[in-house]
Amino acid sequence: MLLFTILFLWCPIFGILAYAVFLGHQRKVSVKALVSLAVMLSLYLGCLGTTKELLGDFLTYKKMFEMVPDDGLWGYILSFGKEPVYYGYTYLAYYLYMGNWNLFVFSLTTLNYLLLSYCILKVGHYLRTSFINQIMALFFMAFFFQEFAAIGNMLRQGLAQSITLAFLVRWYIDRKHSWWIALCALGI
Protein backbone atom coordinates (compact mmCIF):
# COMPACT_ATOMS: atom_id res chain seq x y z
CA MET A 1 0.00 0.00 0.00
CA LEU A 2 2.94 2.34 0.64
CA LEU A 3 3.91 2.28 -3.04
CA PHE A 4 0.37 3.21 -4.10
CA THR A 5 0.22 5.97 -1.50
CA ILE A 6 3.45 7.43 -2.88
CA LEU A 7 2.09 7.13 -6.44
CA PHE A 8 -1.14 8.80 -5.30
CA LEU A 9 0.77 11.70 -3.74
CA TRP A 10 2.92 12.06 -6.87
CA CYS A 11 0.08 11.77 -9.41
CA PRO A 12 -3.33 11.05 -7.86
CA ILE A 13 -5.08 9.66 -10.93
CA PHE A 14 -2.14 7.38 -11.72
CA GLY A 15 -2.00 6.17 -8.12
CA ILE A 16 -5.73 5.44 -8.12
CA LEU A 17 -5.64 3.58 -11.43
CA ALA A 18 -2.52 1.61 -10.47
CA TYR A 19 -4.11 0.59 -7.17
CA ALA A 20 -7.38 -0.40 -8.87
CA VAL A 21 -5.51 -2.51 -11.44
CA PHE A 22 -3.49 -4.11 -8.64
CA LEU A 23 -6.67 -4.95 -6.73
CA GLY A 24 -8.29 -6.29 -9.89
CA HIS A 25 -5.51 -8.86 -10.23
CA GLN A 26 -5.86 -10.20 -6.69
CA ARG A 27 -7.73 -13.39 -5.86
CA LYS A 28 -9.33 -11.83 -2.83
CA VAL A 29 -9.56 -8.20 -1.77
CA SER A 30 -10.18 -7.10 1.80
CA VAL A 31 -12.75 -4.54 2.82
CA LYS A 32 -9.83 -2.41 4.06
CA ALA A 33 -8.34 -2.38 0.54
CA LEU A 34 -11.67 -1.32 -0.99
CA VAL A 35 -12.05 1.40 1.64
CA SER A 36 -8.51 2.60 0.82
CA LEU A 37 -9.48 2.90 -2.84
CA ALA A 38 -12.66 4.77 -1.88
CA VAL A 39 -10.65 7.18 0.29
CA MET A 40 -8.17 7.81 -2.55
CA LEU A 41 -11.02 8.53 -4.97
CA SER A 42 -12.76 10.81 -2.46
CA LEU A 43 -9.60 12.79 -1.70
CA TYR A 44 -8.87 13.18 -5.41
CA LEU A 45 -12.39 14.40 -6.14
CA GLY A 46 -12.22 16.68 -3.12
CA CYS A 47 -9.12 18.30 -4.62
CA LEU A 48 -10.82 18.58 -8.00
CA GLY A 49 -13.82 20.21 -6.36
CA THR A 50 -11.64 23.14 -5.29
CA THR A 51 -10.91 23.98 -8.92
CA LYS A 52 -14.54 24.58 -9.91
CA GLU A 53 -15.48 27.93 -11.33
CA LEU A 54 -17.51 30.14 -9.01
CA LEU A 55 -20.90 30.32 -10.73
CA GLY A 56 -24.52 30.16 -9.60
CA ASP A 57 -25.13 28.62 -6.20
CA PHE A 58 -21.44 27.89 -5.76
CA LEU A 59 -20.71 31.64 -5.76
CA THR A 60 -23.54 32.18 -3.27
CA TYR A 61 -22.07 29.50 -0.97
CA LYS A 62 -18.74 31.34 -1.07
CA LYS A 63 -20.38 34.64 -0.15
CA MET A 64 -22.18 32.95 2.75
CA PHE A 65 -18.89 31.40 3.86
CA GLU A 66 -17.23 34.82 3.84
CA MET A 67 -20.08 36.27 5.97
CA VAL A 68 -19.12 34.12 8.97
CA PRO A 69 -16.95 36.70 10.80
CA ASP A 70 -19.79 39.26 10.66
CA ASP A 71 -21.86 37.39 13.28
CA GLY A 72 -21.68 35.02 16.22
CA LEU A 73 -22.56 31.34 15.80
CA TRP A 74 -26.28 31.62 16.59
CA GLY A 75 -26.68 34.92 14.79
CA TYR A 76 -25.10 33.42 11.69
CA ILE A 77 -27.17 30.24 11.75
CA LEU A 78 -30.44 32.04 12.49
CA SER A 79 -29.86 34.70 9.84
CA PHE A 80 -30.60 32.15 7.11
CA GLY A 81 -33.69 30.61 8.72
CA LYS A 82 -33.07 27.14 7.32
CA GLU A 83 -30.46 24.38 6.98
CA PRO A 84 -29.00 24.85 10.49
CA VAL A 85 -26.63 21.87 10.18
CA TYR A 86 -25.06 23.23 7.00
CA TYR A 87 -24.66 26.75 8.34
CA GLY A 88 -23.40 25.45 11.69
CA TYR A 89 -20.75 23.46 9.86
CA THR A 90 -19.96 26.46 7.65
CA TYR A 91 -19.43 28.61 10.73
CA LEU A 92 -17.16 26.08 12.44
CA ALA A 93 -15.29 25.27 9.23
CA TYR A 94 -14.58 28.93 8.59
CA TYR A 95 -12.54 29.08 11.78
CA LEU A 96 -11.19 25.52 11.54
CA TYR A 97 -9.83 26.22 8.05
CA MET A 98 -8.90 29.83 8.90
CA GLY A 99 -11.27 31.26 6.30
CA ASN A 100 -9.84 29.11 3.49
CA TRP A 101 -12.68 28.54 1.00
CA ASN A 102 -10.80 25.81 -0.86
CA LEU A 103 -10.35 23.72 2.30
CA PHE A 104 -14.06 24.13 3.03
CA VAL A 105 -15.03 22.93 -0.45
CA PHE A 106 -12.48 20.11 -0.20
CA SER A 107 -14.00 18.94 3.09
CA LEU A 108 -17.59 18.94 1.81
CA THR A 109 -16.77 17.31 -1.52
CA THR A 110 -14.60 14.66 0.12
CA LEU A 111 -17.26 13.93 2.73
CA ASN A 112 -19.90 13.63 0.00
CA TYR A 113 -17.87 11.06 -1.92
CA LEU A 114 -16.84 9.18 1.22
CA LEU A 115 -20.50 8.76 2.13
CA LEU A 116 -21.43 7.62 -1.38
CA SER A 117 -18.51 5.17 -1.33
CA TYR A 118 -19.61 3.87 2.07
CA CYS A 119 -23.06 3.19 0.62
CA ILE A 120 -21.67 1.42 -2.44
CA LEU A 121 -19.37 -0.81 -0.39
CA LYS A 122 -22.08 -1.60 2.20
CA VAL A 123 -24.63 -2.53 -0.47
CA GLY A 124 -21.99 -4.46 -2.44
CA HIS A 125 -21.03 -6.47 0.64
CA TYR A 126 -24.68 -7.06 1.55
CA LEU A 127 -25.48 -8.31 -1.96
CA ARG A 128 -22.25 -10.36 -1.99
CA THR A 129 -21.13 -8.83 -5.26
CA SER A 130 -17.59 -9.44 -6.42
CA PHE A 131 -14.91 -6.97 -5.47
CA ILE A 132 -14.46 -6.22 -9.19
CA ASN A 133 -18.10 -5.06 -9.35
CA GLN A 134 -17.58 -2.95 -6.24
CA ILE A 135 -14.48 -1.34 -7.77
CA MET A 136 -16.40 -0.65 -10.98
CA ALA A 137 -19.27 0.87 -8.99
CA LEU A 138 -16.82 3.13 -7.13
CA PHE A 139 -15.31 4.32 -10.42
CA PHE A 140 -18.72 4.84 -11.99
CA MET A 141 -19.82 6.92 -9.00
CA ALA A 142 -16.57 8.88 -8.92
CA PHE A 143 -16.45 9.75 -12.59
CA PHE A 144 -20.16 10.07 -13.36
CA PHE A 145 -20.17 13.51 -14.95
CA GLN A 146 -23.57 14.69 -13.74
CA GLU A 147 -22.76 13.88 -10.11
CA PHE A 148 -19.49 15.81 -10.16
CA ALA A 149 -21.02 18.75 -12.04
CA ALA A 150 -23.94 18.93 -9.62
CA ILE A 151 -21.69 18.87 -6.56
CA GLY A 152 -20.33 22.32 -7.42
CA ASN A 153 -23.63 24.00 -8.08
CA MET A 154 -25.63 22.09 -5.51
CA LEU A 155 -23.08 21.50 -2.77
CA ARG A 156 -25.62 21.32 0.05
CA GLN A 157 -28.11 19.22 -1.87
CA GLY A 158 -25.44 16.70 -2.92
CA LEU A 159 -24.29 16.32 0.66
CA ALA A 160 -27.88 15.98 1.91
CA GLN A 161 -28.45 13.26 -0.70
CA SER A 162 -25.34 11.37 0.41
CA ILE A 163 -26.30 11.60 4.07
CA THR A 164 -29.83 10.40 3.26
CA LEU A 165 -28.42 7.41 1.37
CA ALA A 166 -26.14 6.59 4.32
CA PHE A 167 -29.18 6.72 6.61
CA LEU A 168 -31.15 4.38 4.32
CA VAL A 169 -28.26 1.95 4.00
CA ARG A 170 -27.88 1.79 7.79
CA TRP A 171 -31.63 1.36 8.16
CA TYR A 172 -32.17 -1.37 5.58
CA ILE A 173 -28.87 -3.24 5.71
CA ASP A 174 -27.62 -2.79 9.27
CA ARG A 175 -31.15 -2.53 10.75
CA LYS A 176 -29.99 0.51 12.71
CA HIS A 177 -32.35 3.44 12.94
CA SER A 178 -29.88 6.29 13.23
CA TRP A 179 -32.39 9.12 13.21
CA TRP A 180 -29.68 11.67 13.96
CA ILE A 181 -28.29 10.96 10.47
CA ALA A 182 -31.69 11.66 8.92
CA LEU A 183 -31.96 14.89 10.93
CA CYS A 184 -28.53 15.95 9.66
CA ALA A 185 -29.71 15.40 6.09
CA LEU A 186 -32.81 17.50 6.75
CA GLY A 187 -30.67 20.25 8.27
CA ILE A 188 -28.45 20.56 5.21
List each language-model region with its residue ranges:
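Hydrophobic alpha-helical transmembrane segments of multi-pass membrane proteins
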Residues: 51, 103-111, 142, 151, ...
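Short hydrophobic/aromatic helix or loop-helix immediately within or flanking a transmembrane segment
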Residues: 59-67, 76-99
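Membrane-embedded helix bundles of polyisoprenyl
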Residues: 133-151, 158-165
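Membrane-interface alpha helices of multi-pass inner-membrane proteins
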Residues: 178-188
